[in-house]
Amino acid sequence: VTWKEITHNIFLSKEMGCKNAIITNAAGGISEKLNVGDLMIIEDHINLMGGNPLIGPLKHKDIQRFVDQTEIYCRKLQATALEISRDNGFEIKKGVYLGLTGPAFETPAEIRMLRTIGADAVGMSTIPEAMMANAFGMKIIAISCISNMAAGISPNPLSHEEVSVNT
């Protein structure tokens, strides 16, 4: 799958006039503060996917090549989501999402390393879409559904079926 294919929906959303992007994913929980079934607002991310969707030819008048990523995820949208969840008696956690390429799950040693560098959750999506939306100047909120605990955190083996059932 190419970066262009992965970010196609962001291009389409921009062409349709969208100013905001709501991105969701299923992720493995690394942090001890997370449990299966939790929702986690992504405050920041770590891109270890081995690439960047802004590399290469991008033919769009609105795209910014060298874009600031200091606040890629909109704090105002995060505050609104937290307020709505509190008003409805639902807790949403916050944390740092780390993206890796799949399709294999991580090893316990990799998860220990990811925890050390500050990751709360890990997945195989979201970052390319967020980077492209940010390059278009869109406001972004991203939310992970913690579908499983990462390798070595839970004694249970990981499976795609578990991820599917819990999302």
Residues covered by each model-derived region:
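Internal active-site segments that recognize and position negatively charged phosphoryl groups
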Residues: 66-88
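Short, hinge-like loop/turn segments at secondary-structure boundaries
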Residues: 38-43, 139-142, 158-161
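Active-site/ligand-binding-proximal alpha/beta "capping" segment
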Residues: 83-120
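General beta-strand structural signal in soluble alpha/beta enzymes
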Residues: 21-25, 41, 92-98, 122-124, ...
